């Protein structure tokens, strides 16, 4: 069986005020062209279909148009799971009806979820759609307390493996942060409000291949556990990343081979650095269509710098001054980045600074429970 692995479309994303829906549509057309050219038997999308829980109408329309082509025109089965950006209940709308046409959407976590079985010339292949699952959700559904994403994932996997023949070929879809994988700063939304959000790669040992989503960099955790990365570059911290999809071939014995095929965005991201006068004097036609982050090295602000620079670089999305930051408030710069700390860590530090004492163990436990409940309520909006 041959299938295409993609993830993290983030449809409806607004990047520094720029609506990316046109760029997203163009890259989805590339993915459909790749699927047709490589003659895949299925497409798997490992979460974060939308960028937010309530997506804009143009994002819903783009997904609808894309799935209509894949399912009704090209007759390619599609499996999709919810990620941490998606509202699982909204994504799940019509799932039972769509499954008749081989569009398999797994939104909310369910204790009664069944694997998807597709067949090739060698027999059945079972897909386990491990939709994004918070520990509190796993606790409520399993009746056993699950305090980490790793424990929640273990519970999910047990539910699916109990329904799949032991020696059958198996593929997992999971939206998770695997321990040791490379995270992109300022790119992916943290999975946990507090506590451990990482999962161990050994959880996926029973599967012939695991199609991962969540991290935006295309990377291999092992030969059979891989991230394909996001549809587009969604942060200037991703500027050096190469976006791609994986074409996975599964043979009769369950051995895999993977080909990684690149995706090309209509507008690439680039970072331009230098003093104002030099940047104005330079001619860089290769950057004319790029979305830019401009870092000025001038020691004083330039009046109307962005508008003036846009006569040379028409797509400036972010402008900052390197020297002004360097000579700014050093105390604030030395504070740990929120992305390097959990919400619990940040609140504990805030509490310590404002009350001159640390949280007690009981207070820490109450905070953890409150943040878990808040995360659950946010996903239900």
Which positions does each model-derived feature cover?
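His/Asp/Glu-rich metal-coordinating catalytic cores
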Residues: 55, 82-220
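N-terminal active-site segment of His-dependent metallophosphoesterases
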Residues: 1-68, 75, 364-369, 373
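Alpha-helical scaffolding segments of alpha/beta enzyme cores, especially the outer helices
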Residues: 30, 61-69, 93-96, 155, ...
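Catalytic-core regions built around general acid/base machinery
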Residues: 62-74, 196-207
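Short beta-strand segments at enzyme active-site cores
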Residues: 41-47, 78-82, 169-173
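Accessory, non-catalytic peripheral segments of nucleic-acid enzymes
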Residues: 37, 42, 250-381
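Divalent metal-coordination and catalytic microenvironments
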Residues: 8, 28, 48, 63, ...
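A conserved active-site cap/scaffold subdomain adjacent to cofactor or substrate pockets
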Residues: 201-204, 208-263
């Amino acid at each position: 069986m041959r299938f295409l692995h993609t993830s993290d479309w983030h449809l409806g994303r607004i990047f520094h005020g720029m609506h990316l829906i046109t760029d997203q549509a163009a890259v989805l057309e590339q993915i459909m062209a790749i699927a047709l050219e490589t003659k895949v038997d299925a497409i798997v999308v490992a979460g974060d279909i939308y960028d937010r829980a309530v997506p804009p109408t143009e994002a819903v329309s783009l997904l609808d148009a894309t799935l209509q082509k894949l399912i009704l025109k090209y007759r390619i089965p599609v499996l999709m799971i919810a990620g941490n950006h998606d509202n699982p209940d909204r994504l799940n709308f019509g799932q039972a009806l769509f499954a008749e046409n081989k569009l398999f959407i797994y939104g909310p976590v369910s204790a009664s979820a069944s694997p998807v079985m597709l067949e090739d010339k060698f027999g059945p292949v079972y897909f386990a759609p491990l939709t994004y699952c918070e520990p509190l959700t796993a606790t409520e559904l399993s009746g056993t307390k699950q305090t980490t994403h790793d424990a929640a994932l273990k519970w999910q996997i047990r539910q699916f493996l109990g329904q799949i023949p032991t020696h059958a070929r198996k593929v997992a879809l999971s939206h998770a942060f695997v321990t040791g994988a490379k995270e992109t700063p300022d790119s992916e939304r943290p999975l946990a409000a507090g506590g451990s959000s990482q999962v161990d790669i050994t959880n996926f040992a029973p599967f012939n291949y695991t199609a991962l989503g969540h991290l935006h960099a295309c990377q291999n955790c092992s030969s059979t556990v891989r991230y394909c990365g996001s549809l587009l570059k969604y942060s200037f911290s991703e500027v050096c990343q190469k976006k791609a999809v994986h074409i996975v071939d599964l043979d009769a014995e369950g051995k895999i081979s993977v080909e990684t095929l690149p995706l090309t965005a209509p507008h690439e991201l680039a970072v331009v650095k230098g003093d104002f006068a030099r940047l104005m004097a330079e001619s860089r036609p290769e950057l004319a269509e790029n979305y830019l982050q401009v870092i000025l090295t001038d020691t004083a602000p330039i009046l109307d710098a962005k508008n003036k620079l846009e006569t040379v670089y028409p797509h400036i999305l972010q402008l900052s001054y390197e020297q002004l930051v360097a000579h700014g408030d050093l105390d604030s710069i030395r504070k740990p980045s929120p992305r390097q700390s959990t919400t619990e860590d940040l609140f504990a530090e805030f509490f310590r600074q404002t009350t001159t004492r640390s949280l007690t163990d009981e207070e820490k436990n109450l905070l953890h429970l409150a943040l878990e409940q808040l995360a659950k309520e946010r996903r239900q909006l």
